Regions:
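Low-complexity, intrinsically disordered or signal/transmembrane-proximal segments
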Residues: 12-13, 19, 30-35
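Active-site beta->alpha loop and helix N-cap motifs at the rims of alpha/beta catalytic domains
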Residues: 51-201
Length: 351
């Protein structure tokens, strides 16, 4: 391989609202039987296509899969979203995953996703501490979003496989990544694979990850694993020392401190970032237990609507409960149960 205690609440104003705040490509191996044709060649590249140096990537630790606020008419509420992002970074998160599943990315249009990304930049947030979801069913959309991420300065692009067709050959998934890598060679951005087969229906399986690393070198930086299969996550983390794997649960944080993982990317870190930070930075077992207890409140419930319902409660901001179709508002009984459970955890003092 070539070298190639819960946060103190205060008030924050944003947009008039008051918040309560508590190429790099390796030469292809011709002997590999599943290789796909290269989409570009050196002779066809212009000076503007000349590969640039990949920025240093330091994403690690507690990363919240940050929610995206939705406005009254179904549009992304960027002001409210960036206020939450700032709050999470100030109260424990090492980084953020913008426009992932919790951020309802695939329910927004290409233009809406680009506008949210731009809003993060215009808010002066540290994009070098953030990866942003750029995967799409259409490769042209994935390219456009990944280019925008690179232009704005995000630390990484989190790439879902193209999720409509099921049972596709590995060659098709390699071609998808090839198109993104080739189109962003002049201004590269680190690529993180997003493994969520329950939603996408497709797997970034270990043999395929090895192939992508062999083909595209250091452009492929890591993996977010939302499969819940810790054996798979450990296998993926063992491929290369530099390949960063982030399971989607806080329960993996002890293994991020001294084991195979680079951290976690969690939806419930929207709600328990301070506890996760203690668990990760100082090995605080009590804080980890409280963080996991909060996560388990959502077992058997609709996670994204539930996260947003609890954000509405925590920040005393009812608009946070809005979700984008096809999701629907969290059921009232579930909301009451989750709020009661969360408040009970927060009533305890974590040493």
């Amino acid at each position: 391989m070539p070298a190639c205690e819960p946060a103190t609440r205060s008030i924050e104003h944003c947009g008039g609202m008051v918040y309560w705040i508590g190429g790099w490509r390796k030469t292809r191996r011709q002997s590999s039987q599943n290789q796909v044709p290269a989409m570009t060649n050196a002779a066809s590249m212009t000076s503007s296509d000349t590969p640039s140096k990949l920025p240093t990537n330091t994403l690690h630790g507690v990363i919240a899969a940050v929610a995206t606020a939705v406005g009254e008419h179904g549009e992304p509420d960027s002001a409210r979203s960036t206020a939450l992002a700032r709050f999470l970074l100030e109260t424990g998160c090492d980084g953020l995953n913008v426009l992932g599943t919790t951020g309802e990315a695939t329910s927004f249009s290409l233009d809406q996703r680009r506008r949210v990304m731009t809003a993060y930049a215009e808010a002066g947030l540290p994009l070098d501490r953030m990866m942003v979801g750029t995967g799409a069913a259409a490769v042209a959309d994935a390219i456009a979003l990944t280019k925008h991420a690179a232009e704005l300065g995000f630390a990484g692009a989190l790439v879902l496989p193209p999720f409509y067709y099921k049972g596709v050959h590995d060659d098709g998934l390699v071609a998808y990544i090839d198109a993104i890598v080739t189109a962003t060679a002049a201004q590269p951005v680190s690529i993180y694979l997003y493994h969520f087969p329950a939603q996408s229906g497709l797997h970034w399986h270990v043999a395929l990850i090895r192939r992508l690393l062999d083909t595209f070198g250091e452009r492929i930086v890591g993996l977010k694993d939302s499969s819940g299969d810790m054996a798979y996550a450990r296998d993926a983390a063992s491929i290369l020392p530099r390949f960063k794997v982030f399971p989607s649960t806080e329960a993996a944080l002890p293994e991020a401190r001294s084991g195979p993982f680079a951290g976690c990317i969690s939806a419930t870190a929207n709600l328990n970032a301070d506890l996760c930070a203690r668990a990760y930075r100082s090995g605080d077992a009590a804080a980890l237990a409280e963080a996991v207890t909060i996560r388990k409140l959502f077992d058997g419930k609709a996670l994204v609507p539930g996260i947003k319902a609890l954000l509405a409660h925590i920040h005393d901001a009812p608009p946070w409960a809005r979700v984008e179709p096809p999701l629907s508002t969290f059921a009232a009984a579930d909301r009451a149960a989750v709020i009661a459970g969360y408040d009970a955890v927060r009533a305890k003092r974590v040493a």
